[in-house]
């Protein structure tokens, strides 16, 4: 059978597009700030080298949290935190959060809960956004999004460059933030075959 968020008999929390746009201007590089503000969720950095972070729901280890992108698993178990660094807020329409066991629907990786990242889709009104952000922790984020729907075709294009320099504010020899460069380019094509049929 199908396994859609709409058919799950449990509470689903939403982070709306308005909130994503607001908080995304503060931290365009990832969605950790947004998730940290949700009750019962903690994002914990798991690697000083790559900057990967795990999502802990209700105190359980990050390997028990399942990350989905448009309803499909991104990474499972210990690698789930990689999805945080590959999904900047500018590319998202909303985020759905389920706390508690959904393992019967999504496997053993969803014992603590799941986070479903919903991508933007093109609309008839053209959307063009550009974000440039610098941080006191030696970080730089540049990202852009374009989306538009025509009669039978639509497209979205997301591109980003994230740069972080090693930052040691206490001069202890250990960096508070790792050094990395990240490039993202994510084009999508949508075909509207009929009024109720869409292919992407």
For the regions a language model picked out, list residue spans one by one.
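Outer-membrane beta-barrel pore domains and translocons
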Residues: 1, 100, 118, 131-137, ...
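Short, acidic, small-residue-rich periplasmic hinge/interaction motif at the N-terminus
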Residues: 1-22, 62
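Short, glycine-/polar-rich solvent-exposed loops and beta-turns at beta-strand/coil boundaries
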Residues: 26-27, 41-51, 72, 107-111
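Transmembrane beta-barrel architecture of outer-membrane proteins
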Residues: 30, 52, 82, 92, ...
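Non-catalytic regulatory/gating segments with a bias toward low-complexity or hydrophobic composition
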Residues: 35, 95-96, 115-117
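Short sequence motifs at beta-strands and strand-loop junctions characteristic
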Residues: 49, 107, 135-138, 177-181, ...
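Short acidic/polar hinge/loop motifs at secondary-structure boundaries
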Residues: 54-56, 64, 72-99
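Periplasmic-side early beta-strands and strand-to-turn transitions of outer-membrane beta-barrels
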Residues: 116, 123-125, 145-200
């Amino acid at each position: 059978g199908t396994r859609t968020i709409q058919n799950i008999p449990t509470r689903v929390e939403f982070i709306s597009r308005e909130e994503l746009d607001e908080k995304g201007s503060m931290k365009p590089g990832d969605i950790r700030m947004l998730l940290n503000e949700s009750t019962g969720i903690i994002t914990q950095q798991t690697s000083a080298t790559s900057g990967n972070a795990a999502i802990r729901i209700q105190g359980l280890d990050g390997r028990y949290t399942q990350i989905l992108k448009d309803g499909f698993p991104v990474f499972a178990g210990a690698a789930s935190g990689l999805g945080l660094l590959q999904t900047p807020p500018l590319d998202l329409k909303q985020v759905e959060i389920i706390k508690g066991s959904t393992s019967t629907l999504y496997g053993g990786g969803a014992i603590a809960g799941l986070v479903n990242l919903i991508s933007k889709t093109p609309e008839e009104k053209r959307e063009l956004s550009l974000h440039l952000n610098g941080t006191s922790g030696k970080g730089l984020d540049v990202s852009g999004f374009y989306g538009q729907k025509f009669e039978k075709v639509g497209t979205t294009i997301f591109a980003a460059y994230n740069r972080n320099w090693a930052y040691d504010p206490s001069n202890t020899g250990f960096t508070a933030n790792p050094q990395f460069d990240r490039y993202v380019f994510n084009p999508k094509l949508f075909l509207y075959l009929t009024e109720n049929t869409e292919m992407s």
